[in-house]
């Protein structure tokens, strides 16, 4: 396909237009007085949300050069969401501020490489200043405050705090639909381990890129599956019952994995395969833990068992299994309480006998997974649209809370970013490098300015007032007053604020140093071409 190329100012201005279109849409949601955005869906009802990354990912612009600029900002939001789980709107606002100021200077003749060095230096100093002002999460109230601010809902904050209290800071918390309109927290037996799906074609939810299996059978084996014939009798039995299947195996290689994926895509059955957790003897022990939890049997050479002879009775079962690219969570396994308790007691005895600190630590992890359970937040709402919006808020709140547990929290409402500006004044630089530092200093004001403007207040007035206040005093947009943000319970996770700034600075610096943009030239006849004939498919596996 022919390419269209733009250079220098033409390239940067086209991309800047895309950056602004996306950022202007996302930033309307910022702060306690932020608005919602309605997203059209290809099917079903529209989605109403204030979740920055969801909005950013849904935007496609007609002009391909503008679209590239928009996609780079969406990448900032997505990366921030991947690292910290929240802060996507802050990252977008910071990116827009840095890019706009940077483009003006580059257009005026400044050297973009010098500006980039200044941006990098300023970001490094700002991140260190954020870490120094960070406070550790110590109480249930701290967790409740962080979750409440992220979700803009005190009830959600209380739910998350209750869930974390029940399963611990490192415990597994999942989100499900409730059958009623109320939202509640239940603790069920379950566990999570660090292994994700073997193929992304196994996902059932393309937005979240995760696979959800309701009431599945679970095949647990320490064998390598390379021939589909080995598990064919078992697959046929599962298909006849109309149930989903989770396969936990040493590995699936050869033609076995493509065959499973092909049948999954065709809708023959719903299957997800993951590698067994752990290594060596620890792997065998963890597989046995999963078998006890789900009421299944480990199909193992050690026991003289064969996959060809395995029956449905030897499969484990669970109420629900969720698999992401990195983790597998089994909720409400079908194992008997007596068997689980017996296994727990056995692990406790092993801990008591062990003389190795490393072994004790690994045994404690197994014990926590087996006995800690999984907290399930059941989200209820009157309509499907409200349910989607509520789940987005709860997911953000949960992610923000986990981030705060890891790295602590700082004063919220953009206050921390204003408070780090004096640290940037101490950096020694000149010329274009100094310009880059000043660009970051100005950008650090943008989140507070946007929160104020969304609340109907002049942003510049609020920013100037905050610069004259002592550290920690911020603008509470919900009540329209200045106060100590930590005492008021308005806090942000340090990881969220840090990631937003680092990712915004990284992509902004790349945009400013862009000198040429290459895009596909639109084909004027594309809409007039007849659709391609459908391709023939392979026969079914069964």
From Swiss-Prot:
Question: Which PROSITE patterns did the record assign?
Answer: CHAPERONINS_CPN60
- Identify the GO cellular component terms for this protein: cytoplasm
Q: What is its EC number?
A: 5.6.1.7
Among InterPro entries, the record links this protein to:
Chaperonin_Cpn60_CS, Cpn60/GroEL, Cpn60/GroEL/TCP-1, GroEL-like_apical_dom_sf, GROEL-like_equatorial_sf, TCP-1-like_intermed_sf
The UniProt record lists the keyword Cytoplasm: yes
Spell out the subcellular localization from the entry: Cytoplasm
Per UniProt, subunit arrangement is: Forms a cylinder of 14 subunits composed of two heptameric rings stacked back-to-back. Interacts with the co-chaperonin GroES.
Name the job this protein performs. Together with its co-chaperonin GroES, plays an essential role in assisting protein folding. The GroEL-GroES system forms a nano-cage that allows encapsulation of the non-native substrate proteins and provides a physical environment optimized to promote and accelerate protein folding.
For this protein, the record's NCBIfam families field holds: GroEL (TIGR02348), PRK00013.1 (NF000592), PRK12849.1 (NF009487), PRK12850.1 (NF009488), PRK12851.1 (NF009489)
Q: What is the protein name given in its UniProt record?
A: Chaperonin GroEL
Q: Specify the species.
A: Limosilactobacillus reuteri (strain DSM 20016) (Lactobacillus reuteri)
